[in-house]
């Protein structure tokens, strides 16, 4: 056995570094510190400049490296090394990924980095290694950094204390909403879509003119997101209003497409723009899989003919299919329609995380711009005061030029002599001594007084501005107008007119009311089939009718569970013991040549959940649902249709599970419990509900509900014994009682399994 490894003996001070505390408290404190670090230093953007620390550090490092738009690009590896060595104590991969994202036109609405080389593409291909690519800042990045060297923002020590970095950038435009952001922290996440910067600035101007403007007013200026990849936003205005009011919601977007005639009555669909953050290669693969799996019944072929622009060609299976119907079916099945989640979770000026609506975010940005304005003004004021002080000294020197020149030439300590003779300060004396004699002799009183007067006028203007909040807000608006004009010069091939009058990428539209399902069903040949579902959950569909079920073959240890006659155009409903309904298209079921396929591969059904009933959907029919706890209700069959693989929760079963799902065929309902007691009551006493728990059907001291039977009072009740023989029940009225009663014991000769029909 290996000997345990012990720590080396420590010195006399080691006891000071050993903490004796409960493990839970130590873990809790450290995890909290980690969570706060992740939230504040990595995952969430600042509401003022819209940047996470890594993006801010990349831009600041590039600014220090003088990688301005008019400069030559430098290797990205050089930038990453600068960021990692001086500001960001993390891996180079995360820094390079952040830099690459800032340069991608399909990721950023306004790219902040100009990349040269392979920076990835909309297909999802990665960027080239950092040693091969080069970068520099864009004009938009310069707008974010404008004033960084004029004390516009606070600085803090870097991680090693060797340098300083900005806490936030001056941010000339509302970058948070302009470029959006996404990130996952501990216990919270953020997801912000990009917007049109010109529209955002117009909204800011509206808030400057009317701080009481509502979110609805702001939506007149910012009607919705503006995604870099274009596309069509089909989210309703009411939904967008709620999203921007609360800061939470989502935006539904679709691919932009057009119809191209190919002659002889045929056509093809060409997709020119796809939803934001959808990888084109994955989309093509998804559409191809839909064709192979026969889920896209109207689509015949898909081709990617993209070059610099996106061009996905979709060929319909039949020329008789309407283009709108084809696209609606694909929107339902593929990423041609996507939903971008919105969660404007950001750090405020104090570093506190919180969810903001669009008005709160813009107001925080405007407050930041005002602070930047006043800080730059005070910085300029200090510069002016210093220059005026020097000009006063130079004016004294000019008025006494001969004496000043004599002192400078012949005195051993000219500085002390100047101060003593003319009453100058150290700064004024140094300024005179630092001026060459030739320049000192060329000083002109008019020039000094002119510069002095200009600076005094500028100083008075700054002081007046600092004393007036109204003037400050006015200058903020003027600055935003200048930034707006600069941003509008940035053009892109996808730019189109927007509702606000400016150009943008995304447009707005409405999803047409097209019944794609009906069109798909119309193309399915209507044929009779028999659905076979085994006890272990293997499903298949046989053509025609099965006369002798005993001839069916199953896997070893398996046997018949359900035998359901249907048609290929039917929707198959599956009811599970956890109260959920699942829907499968009968035309998509595997053939009966083999044993079929596990139904759990087609629907999300847990292994512990049992299938209670299987039947084809029929419009206008009603079902009786009941749980083993003895509760139930009446439900229209339309409420059972589910569009998701996870199904639709309809019956709240609690811990007991579902008991039965009966077709409502008469006016009476008979229920039997595990205790062998039967209760019959009118079906009209059951409420009709789309979902829920229902009302009490029968009372039990022990056990629960076992089975039920719906029948017509005129034809009478019955049961089917274990041999499959029908037994009419003439005395059924003796078991009639009030709903929720206990009932009476079963009649003589009743089925031994205490069920109205064999399970």
Curated annotation (Swiss-Prot):
Enzyme nomenclature, EC number: 5.6.2.2
Organism: Caulobacter vibrioides (strain ATCC 19089 / CIP 103742 / CB 15) (Caulobacter crescentus)
Gene: parC
Record has DNA-binding as a keyword: yes
Single GO MF annotation: ATP binding
GO biological process, one term: chromosome segregation
Cystine connections: none
Transmembrane segments: none
CDD domains associated with the record: TOP4c (cd00187)
Subcellular compartments: Cell membrane
Protein name: DNA topoisomerase 4 subunit A
